[in-house]
Amino acid sequence: MERRDCDAIVLFGATGDLCYRKIFPALYHLARRSLLTVPVIGVARAGTDLRGLIARVQASIGEFVKGADAAVTSRLTELLRYVDGDYNDRATFVALRKTLADAQRPLHYLAIPPSVFATVAEHLSGTGSVAGARIVVEKPFGRDLASADRKSVV
């Protein structure tokens, strides 16, 4: 079987606590080992911009990575892109599709509330952003068996 690595990472909830405490430090460690070479696209409804995301990533690394190397942090921040918008607004996903450019195998990481999983998945599908993609769900998958079953249909 042919190995097909992702060619972009999309972080939904990029300005949230999970990304700040766990995901950004993990990305730093991948970059340190030269294992992260693809664009990392943050998506959030924070009213910020790329500069704001870069500042947040730098603060996260400063707080959670002991002895961080500024050159590695710089390499990581050079990979960053940002899409600001509402998860309920199709325009956010149109902007994401444009930011993904030629990416054929993006990894969509959902570090967002479970209540918007289905909406995000539907918008990704409706804008052509899921063909060849993978979706990682970070949160509990539903509140109970019935809601988990509904989400698995999406």
Regions found by a protein language model. Name each.
Residues 6-7, 34-39, 77-79, 105, ...:
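Short glycine-/polar-rich loops that comprise or flank the Walker A/P-loop
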Residues 153-154:
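Conserved small/polar residues in nucleotide/adenosyl-binding loops
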